[in-house]
């Protein structure tokens, strides 16, 4: 049943020209150089340190590594992070 539901969502997304992140509950990651990263549709903050941030996503985690991280804004499903970003990884669960 789950696979059929996902196929139906994908078909509707294409047919109605809706952005995939909206219809399929995918994260949207926007970077400005290596200085800022804005992540929408996350499921929560798992870890925050000066050098690493881990966010829970619907199907895994987003791990951001770098230096001097500061959370500039955080909302239930959005986060704006500032610092020197070296690596952005997606780990499926």
Swiss-Prot record:
It holds the Pfam family YabP. InterPro entries: Spore_YabP/YqfC, Spore_YqfC. NCBIfam families: spore_yqfC (TIGR02856). This is Uncharacterized protein YqfC. It comes from Bacillus subtilis (strain 168).
């Amino acid at each position: 049943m789950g696979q059929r539901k996902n196929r139906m969502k994908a078909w509707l997304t294409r047919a109605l020209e809706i952005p995939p992140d909206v219809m399929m509950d995918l994260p949207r990651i926007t970077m400005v150089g290596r200085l800022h990263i804005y992540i929408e549709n996350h499921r929560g903050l798992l870890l925050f340190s000066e050098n690493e941030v881990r966010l829970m996503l619907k199907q895994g985690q987003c791990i951001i590594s770098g230096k001097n991280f500061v959370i500039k804004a955080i909302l239930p499903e959005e986060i704006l992070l500032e610092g020197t970003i070296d690596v952005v990884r997606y780990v499926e669960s």
